[in-house]
Amino acid sequence: MSSRPPASPPAQGSRLLLLSLLLLGTVPGPRPGSAFYLPGLAPVNFCAEEKSNECKADIELFVNRLDSVESVLPYEYTAFDFCQASEGKRPSENLGQVLFGERIEPSPYKFTFNKKETCKLVCTKTYNTEKAEDKQKLDFLKKSMLLNYQHHWIVDNMPVTWCYEVEDSQKFCNPGFPIGCYITDKGHAKDACVISSEFHERDTFYIFNHVDIKIYYHVVETGSMGARLVAAKLEPKSFKHTHIDKPDCSGPAMDISNKASGEIKIAYTYSISFEEEKNIRWASRWDYILESMPHTHIQWFSIMNSLVIVLFLSGMVAMIMLRTLHKDIARYNQMDSTEDAQEEFGWKLVHGDIFRPPRKGMLLSVFLGSGTQILIMTFVTLFFACLGFLSPANRGALMTCAVVLWVLLGTPAGYVAARFYKSFGGEKWKTNVLLTSFLCPGIVFADFFIMNLILWGEGSSAAIPFGTLVAILALWFCISVPLTFIGAYFGFKKNAIEHPVRTNQIPRQIPEQSFYTKPLPGIIMGGILPFGCIFIQLFFILNSIWSHQMYYMFGFLFLVFIILVITCSEATILLCYFHLCAEDYHWQWRSFLTSGFTAVYFLIYAIHYFFSKLQITGTASTILYFGYTMIMVLIFFLFTGTIGFFACFWFVTKIYSVVKVD
């Protein structure tokens, strides 16, 4: 049967995280091979005859959960009425894999190294449409084909890919392949049904019940060690086998009409072949998948765009710091040395109020503590990702690393919150510690738990098991909270932060502000430039989460992270200076909200992405999308807001420490 690849990918590939990680030849750094296997993922040698100490003869194929670009609900393999493994041990999964809904299980597909098989029968499924149970299974299968659910198979810890040509004769290797496809009642071919003219019957489903698998191997230099697998590719096909007991993989496609009645039999078969590949080494075997990913040139454009913004802001800040501030300080100090210098003006006027405690200082200090926790966690996670420790080959490592770091970073969160709360003149230290421990994490967990209830109700594999929820709560209550208390203890034990100028007892009246120096316009403007640095990367990150594309360019992401920190800092300092010149000394909350407003632009972009890029249907999927988006927005708000506050705090402390004040 003809199986010409479609002109455009029927699905966007397989997700590995907010959600899968690595720097790979995109910026100077480790070569792809060495980067992927830094953690010590040892190669497995294969040979035609089993040699227990040297190599294996049997090749195991594992199946992962199935997902769709048209639904947020993944399902594990056993939820479908496919051929099931009669035996085999389920691989253990780490915390990150469980949180991302990965459910890896043994499959009924068994191979022997270098042994060719043609049209081998795996199993036959029979459905009687008059039986309620059979009809329910068949309907679930049809719905999954309608929503373009994708298989994800794994051989030797490597995805089995379906490679085909897309626009401009580029080859795209999809780490998944569809269950089947659908021809509408108007004769329109959906998704993968465009690959063959044999898929033409109206209001009919075509199931891919046969796969041609080709495994590529590289012979180890020593020879006696056998060979290592370097690629696994397949081509899905559909056959209505004439003789189900002895299939020959020929004939018309396996069609399931929406109007079909009576008995329907589906025989699942496969063919396997092996080919030696001399040009690909085991250490670089992921390259062919990652190099087929599109838009690398856009990443460079993103970096250049961000650097232009940084240079612009750096020039503005440098001009203020070196010219304006330098002149101001010299003038103020010169005026102080003269007898007739009685009148002050500009930002020096508010020196007696600049460190006045802000309103809602408790809440601000709690936000700063949580933001510090997120900031350090993000930096360390991305740093390890750049080194290759959190690569796609190391499944679930990204989320596991992030969660563990967040738990262990309770101490700096408690310390920062306590130090600033004490400097704000706060005395309710118990409330401060409890809020730091439970407020922001509690909001995230409550949202996450509600989303999990929806996933449970829908029977999705992404629903976190009860045992894992208990484990997460144990990490939070038994490790993170005590560490937060320890950090807060040392924070409150230290003296309050010393300010370079004294605070007056009577607050100074703030003069009437122009439109541009009022709080809201400044806050709205402050988030535009930081968002401009990240919006292109944001597109790829959202693609990896919701469109199941593999994300691996962590070199780019780390650079963008550094640029974002610089941009948030400089934009906040710039606006802070203008507000101080307008004699408005309420800088604490304003600095936090100015850079934190970047998260609002993130939310607006996520809404735009949902309506313009995604094909998600269904109430549950929509609620899940926006529920998880709100978690990301909150985390990003705390992250960027904390950067802005620290930058402004440093700036204000610096400028008021170098002027003479009576």
From Swiss-Prot:
Its main location: membrane. Residues 1-28 form the signal peptide. Keywords: Cytoplasm, Cytoskeleton, Endosome, Golgi apparatus, Membrane, Signal, Transmembrane, Transmembrane helix. It is a multi-pass membrane protein. Residues 321-373, 419-436, 487-521, 575-590, 652-662 are cytoplasmic. Disulfide bonds: none annotated. GO terms for biological process: ceramide metabolic process; glycosphingolipid biosynthetic process; regulation of heparan sulfate proteoglycan biosynthetic process. Residues 29-299, 395-397, 458-465, 543-553, 612-630 are lumenal. GO terms for cellular component: endosome membrane; Golgi apparatus; microtubule organizing center. InterPro entries: EMP70. The keyword Cytoplasm applies. PANTHER family: TRANSMEMBRANE 9 SUPERFAMILY MEMBER 2 (PTHR10766:SF111), TRANSMEMBRANE 9 SUPERFAMILY PROTEIN (PTHR10766). In the intracellular compartments, may function as a channel or small molecule transporter. Belongs to the nonaspanin (TM9SF) (TC 9.A.2) family. This is Transmembrane 9 superfamily member 2.
